[in-house]
UniProtKB/Swiss-Prot annotation:
Residues 81-92, 122-131, 168-180 have a biased composition (Acidic residues). This is Protein phosphatase inhibitor 2. The modification Phosphoserine is found at residues 45, 88, 90, 122-123, 131. One of its GO terms (molecular function) is molecular function inhibitor activity. Phosphorylation on Ser-45 by ATM activates PP1 by dissociating the PP1-PPP1R2 complex. Phosphorylation on Thr-74 by GSK3 activates PP1 by dissociating the PP1-PPP1R2 complex. Inhibitor of protein-phosphatase 1. Pfam families: IPP-2. GO terms for biological process: glycogen metabolic process; regulation of signal transduction. Residues 186-206 have a biased composition (Polar residues). It comes from Mus musculus. Gene3D superfamilies: 6.10.250.1050. The modification Phosphothreonine is found at residues 74, 97, 117. Belongs to the protein phosphatase inhibitor 2 family.
């Protein structure tokens, strides 16, 4: 009998239920009137005004921490200058051969880079504001900087001079050897002629 009474009683939880302490014992749902159930549901649940939520939390102008960049794209400028054709690669679909490349390099070698000419133009304007000591320091600095940046050119020139000197030395040695060889040939021929003269004198005298 204890088993049958235990099956009809609801299982009690550890936590106290506020409604169970104040309300009368639980009556099966068939005996309860309907309005009480709706009343309990309205107390426990909330009604959401979805249009109000959309208007409040999702306005059209809200960016949610994301930035919109309204800048135009950075423009790309081709090289601007007088000798654009010397540096441009837009001569049709012309194939770059070593001869053409050598001609272009030779044409570009004599001209000074554009950034250096711009630096020189701008430095002339700045010199007017400096004292004589500062001008002298700046002049020395620029001179040292030019020497440093032109060091590669100086190395090329030094190599050319060294190779030219070596080539000249080789030619001098060859000329000295040929001169020595010629003098030896002259001596041999003169010795040969003297011996032939002696032989002729001997043959005539005998």
């Amino acid at each position: 009998m204890a088993a049958s009474t235990a099956s009809h009683r609801p299982i009690k939880g550890i936590l106290k239920n506020k409604t169970s302490a104040a309300s009368p014992p639980v009556v099966p749902s068939a005996e309860q009137p309907r309005p009480i159930v709706e009343e309990e549901l309205s107390k426990k649940s909330q009604k959401w005004d979805e249009m109000n939520i959309l208007a409040t939390y999702h306005p059209a102008d809200k960016d949610y921490g994301l930035m919109k960049i309204d800048e135009p794209n950075t423009p790309y400028h081709n090289m601007i200058g007088d000798d654009e054709d010397a540096y441009s690669d837009s001569e049709g679909n012309e194939v770059m051969t070593p001869d053409i490349l050598a001609k272009k390099l030779a044409a570009a070698e004599g001209s000074e880079p554009k950034y250096r000419t711009r630096e020189q133009e701008s430095s002339g304007e700045e010199d007017n504001d400096l004292s004589p000591e500062e001008r002298e320091k700046k002049r020395q600095f620029e001179m040292k900087r030019k020497l440093h940046y032109n060091e590669g050119l100086n190395i090329k020139l030094a190599r050319q001079l060294i190779s030219k000197d070596l080539h000249d030395d080789d030619e001098d040695e060859e000329m000295a050897e040929t001169a020595d060889g010629d003098s030896m040939n002259v001596e041999e021929s003169s010795q040969g002629s003297t011996t032939s003269d002696h032989l002729q004198h001997k043959s005539q005298s005998s």
